[in-house]
């Protein structure tokens, strides 16, 4: 399966290969079950299992800094994990002061990912995301990230070509 190919290509068993919420309407449970069968991990089933703060949320929020957004989310949803998307090391520095549970490192090259992982060591967990393919996942995994998320596991997986010939 596509998920199994990503898990093998990562060549780092302790790192989670995560799916995303990008699923076919009405097929989410089956597509996510297929990811697990292939050795991947379901990241989130819906918007209800974690707080993910992304760039669009911050643009619309208008409440100040990224760190303030994390603090507000933690006060409003104390039982949920908080994950923040960053795409620069400067954003990461600011976010780390608010102590999120996870940071999503979006569209970062392996060297930048390595630096980000080092900055997060002993603090929050790290997830690499954005444009990760079968040919790039091993280099991304080698940076030491805790997880890699791949939307293609659910939105672009190709069905197996099955056929059945019946002879009478």
Model-derived features: positions:
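Acidic/glycine-rich phosphate/pyrophosphate-binding loops and surrounding catalytic core
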Residues: 1-87, 91-98, 102, 111-119, ...
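Short secondary-structure boundary segments
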Residues: 107, 130, 152-153
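Short acidic, glycine/proline-enriched helix-loop-strand junctions
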Residues: 122-125, 167-168
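Cys/His-rich Zn2+-binding cysteine-cluster or related metal-binding knuckle/ribbon modules and their
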Residues: 134
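Short, charged, intrinsically disordered terminal tails
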Residues: 152-168
């Amino acid at each position: 399966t596509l998920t199994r190919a990503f898990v093998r290509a990562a060549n780092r068993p302790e790192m989670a290969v995560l799916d995303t919420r990008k699923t076919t309407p009405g097929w989410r449970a089956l597509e996510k079950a297929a990811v697990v069968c292939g050795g991947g991990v379901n990241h989130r089933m819906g918007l209800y299992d974690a707080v993910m703060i992304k760039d669009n949320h911050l643009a619309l929020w208008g409440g100040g800094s990224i760190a303030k957004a994390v603090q507000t989310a933690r006060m409003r949803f104390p039982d949920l994990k908080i994950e923040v998307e960053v795409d620069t090391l400067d954003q990461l520095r600011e976010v780390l002061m608010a102590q999120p549970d996870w940071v999503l490192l979006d569209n970062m090259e392996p060297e930048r990912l390595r630096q980000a992982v080092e900055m997060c060591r002993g603090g929050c967990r790290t997830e690499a995301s954005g444009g990760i393919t079968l040919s790039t996942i091993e280099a991304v995994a080698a940076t030491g990230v805790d997880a890699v998320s791949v939307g293609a596991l659910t939105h672009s997986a190709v069905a197996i070509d099955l056929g059945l010939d019946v002879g009478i």
